Amino acid sequence: MSEEVKKDQEPQTEAPKKKVAAKKEEAPAEKPAAKPAAPKKPKDKPYIDMPTCVGCSVCIEACPMDCIQLSEPKFHGDIRTYAYLSDEKKCIGCGMCEKACPIDVITMCQPGEIPDKYTKGETSMCQDLFKVYCRVFQAVMKVGNYFMGYRMPDYIQGAGCIKQLPGIIKSKGLTKVLVVTDGGLLKLGVPDGLFEAMKEVGLEYEVFSNIIHNPTSDNVEEGYKLFRETGCQGLIAFGGGAPMDCAKAIAAKNAHPNKTVAQMQGLLKVHKKICPFWAVPTTSGTGSETTVAAVITDSATHHKASINDPSILPKYAVLDPELTIGLPPYVTAQTGMDALCHAVESYTNWTYCTALEKDLSKKAVRLIYDNLLTAYEDGKNFEARQNMQIAAFYAGRSFTRGCVGYVHAVGHTLGGLYGIAHGQAMSVILPHVMAQYGPAVYDKLADLADVCGMTGVTNEEKAKKFIAWIREMNEKMNIPKGFQQIKDEDIPQMITWAKAEANPLYPVPVIWGDDDFRRLIHTLQTAE
Amino acid sequence: MESKYSGYMGRVVMYDLSTQTLTDYPWSDRERELFIGGKTMASKIMLDNFTGQEKPFSEENLIVITTGPLTGTGAPSSSRFNISTLSPQTLITTSSNCGGRFGWYLKKAGFDALILKGKCPEHSWLEINNDKFVMHNADDLWGLKTGETQEALQEKHKMPNGKLMKYGQLAIGPAGENQVLYASVISDERASGRGGVGAVFGWKNLKAITVRGNKTVPVKDPEKTKQWIIKWDKYIKSHPLTGNQLPRLGTAGLVSSMQMRGMLSSKNYNYGKYEHFDKVNGETLAEDFNIVNKGCLTCPMKCARTVEVNGKPVKGPELETLGLLGGGILNPNLADILKWNYEIDELGMDTISASSTLAYAMEANEKGLWKNGLEFGKTDNISQIWDDVAHRRGIGAELADGSKRLSEKYGGKEFAIHSKGMELAAYEPRRAVGQGLGYAVSNRGGCHLNGGYLVIVEGLGLYTNPLTHHAKADFTMLFQNLMETISASGQCLFTSYAFFPGFLITRPNGVITTIANKAIPFIGGVLRLINRVSPALALHLPVFHHTKIFSYALGMPMTFGKYIRTGERSYNVERLVNSKFGVNASWDTLPKRLTDTPQDPNNPKTKVPLETLKKTYYKARGWDQNGLPTKHTLRKLGLGEYC
Amino acid sequence: MINVELFGLFRLDTKIKGFELDPSAEGVSTVKDIYPILLKKAKEVNPATKICAKDIDGCIIIINGVQSKKSAHVNDGDKIQLMSPVCGG
């Protein structure tokens, strides 16, 4: 079922599926059903704050169960060792370590939580001044956002609507386009329907598919060369985030042939009209069809950074759920959680969002809550696929103005250094960052919990339930809890890159310093 | 007496080993302000209790175990404690500092200090659990080496569920039991090595002490203390000496530098270099033998080595042991030194005195003064020698008395390398005359640290003219004063090395460093003034974090000037109590080899101009020509009652 | 030949104990001329090394037992020792 091109309106979703609990079989009338025992809360365990621990070993001395150890020195003479809970099972939760620690880096709490005192962000005179600078910057950006002209792309929606695209392109006067996609989709024949439709209407095309998970500056240069040398006039980005971002960067390069990709990375460095650009997402998703960002890895330095400019926001999008039916479960999971990450980060960020973006975030979260697991377990479920596509669209539009946060900043470094797929990075990192923000995000996460029908007495409780739900989703969809492959020697570089990307642009709930990033990365390294 | 200051537990006790009675020993806040704790507190206690007639091996001799107020607060490197007593080696008081966990647990039991007098009627070990003191028979422990003793103590400290209690411990080995004059006391892997404190334990039939408790050391301002600790820790870890050299090379890293400066004593201080130094230096130790570096509780520097001996990871040697058992006896085999270091620790002896006495014996044999079969470079019998010494067997019985007594018996006083009866520590002072002064005037005998450790400016860290006497006396006094207070507060002396701004170390050829090195001999007058008017220096130096921690953790106001003055007082208290036992200028000596024989026959300056240095030093200290504090000095230091 | 020996942390960092060089063949007339040769050797031993000239400047330079500077001249037969400052006790 296809529809007329919609301009700057929200796409229609399938009626939201209400989660209806299965009816319990009625117990025999004589015996009232026994109330299930409330799950026993696990014992508090020591949270030892790795970045601020000085390795004095006083806690090790105080522990009666010998379940705290000093980390292994990384080289002979390494003195930057720190205490850690080496045997959680042995720990009896006595709190002697917390009492003994002279610098208050140990606090007893529920396993997996980060006590509030370590979530306030690094404090020092320099850091406090820097935080003020960031907030002033963001306040100015907020005003500037009003002049940015964010919009929803014009779009067509519905099963099979991809076949209409060539006709629409031809009606704009174009005769040749470059289709940017990835080799995997080509092999699977996913774009074949588009190619046939283009042949039918006589629209010429070239295909550029030399793109990996995280497109590189070399990919962009190669794609642009093909675009220019074959006389293409427009671009179709067909696929997930990688072809989308690559195509956007090719469009930017086409607007500025003499600039390198690195020179266009950052804020507002394109500011020129690009060639006609259609975005056809086949994942749900990066939302890249609605965003002003294109994330490209520099081939020489492996630094992943974003071109951020409203100029590269696609003018048109094609939302055809049939294109996502064949997505393997793991891609469904990772891209779905990527969409969730967009919605959550945008919503929890400070000041940039207007009521529209907040509303879109909430809608996206609810759609993901209702549909992602279904889409993961039953890929052929049309409604789930369609709703996930819409969710990704909403979330993408939301973060276009609301921005992303440290989940993305750190995730990009993993993509650059270890080639970790963006969606996987987002899925894994999201719950850890939200937990580390602590009370700063309780209210907003509680709103999202409300949207999903989660209950709780306090906002803190609801927020923690929401984070627990994210972890649960990851577990159900076989997404790992952390990244043990992160090497210690890469951490300084990761922190430098993440800070450069996020501070001061991203209006994150808590502005982090080096120790805060170390805390997160340590959590990622050690999460099991 | 309870204290208004934090950091102190408020209780000092005296335990009579003869009658097994415990009494409280009065200790006021005024005394805490003047003497802080640690070795200074011990000296004051000995000053008030000794008449000068006491003998080391007597019931009247006290063993004074003191902690510092910073122990238990978490300050960097603050877990050190002190054992002081009348030394059987020097016959004057000695203080012996240690990084083991005993002091930490003594405070958890609720005590700032423990004074022992009397004598156990039988072989005993003392168990302290909070304020409960229980004496146990130690026949099953007597004869065991220190490691074995500590393992056996573990069995005695297991809870019904099999878990080991947490406690601190002291133990002597066979050397202490047999009253080897330089027997040590071991705490975990660390040693109260010098001065023969272990022999006093042994004479008193005290094999071991364990202590545990559940009290908390109070901290005045936990938040400010925490921030200061974090800041100080970062500073220490980023300093080239404390954060790079000490962890990666340990004190062993000095061997090559000493060789280059001619300060590496070899063949019993006949020479200042050793041709095979590269086989027994810190680099070889790091590259081929070190397993991991370890640290005392709360220490960020983690300078201790761990090596493998007989397939077991054990504590590795410090610089002095490497020097004295390497070039000192012409042994180029590092593996032997590692083995001997372990054996000596296990037997419970001071590695420095043991090695230096051995070297004396080798030279005496070589010169035909004493036929003992010991030869430089002959190393196949040395393990047996240590065992014989510890058990006073054969020539071991003679070696057990140290080089001073041996030289009095056999001759060769000029090459019995000791001062006041305690052997010197491998740094050859004829190429670092300021260190030579320090050795001679050190209160406990031939100690390089108590002597001011001037080698750090005479060629190892900085490199001012090592042969001039100018300014050396004043520098010695300043460094001694600072280090006294560091020790008294419970911290490790190595924290003071970060006093030298990092760029002076990382830019040895830089303009400022060059100027500083050239200027040092000319600033004696300035240092004299600083020492004289120290209380006026009511400031804190950014390179010296030790002062602010006093106000934050203890609530005791402290400035850089007051810190120096407190150290000066400490040094004088020690001098006072030793003067009761006859110490004066005639005791501040070095063997003639170091004062009369140039190390380089072509350079007459390569010997220690001790008399010149002493003269200046006494003046700087405010002592008379006899090397004793004047009344004016004592009054200035608040010690007027001892005039 | 000139004999160059490394000690202290500098030796641990470069993983070089020492080496010989022919001053005339290598164009070495001062200590500073040895720097590129030493850095090249350090790179050969450990391609990932971050040792640079600044680290050599951080060493005490001793030529034939006498402390010197990097501008000091060196001759055939000289022994040069590079040593990091140390402390202990």
Language-model regions, residue ranges each:
Chain C
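Ubiquitin-like/PB1-type beta-grasp interaction modules and other compact soluble beta-rich domains
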Residues: 1-88
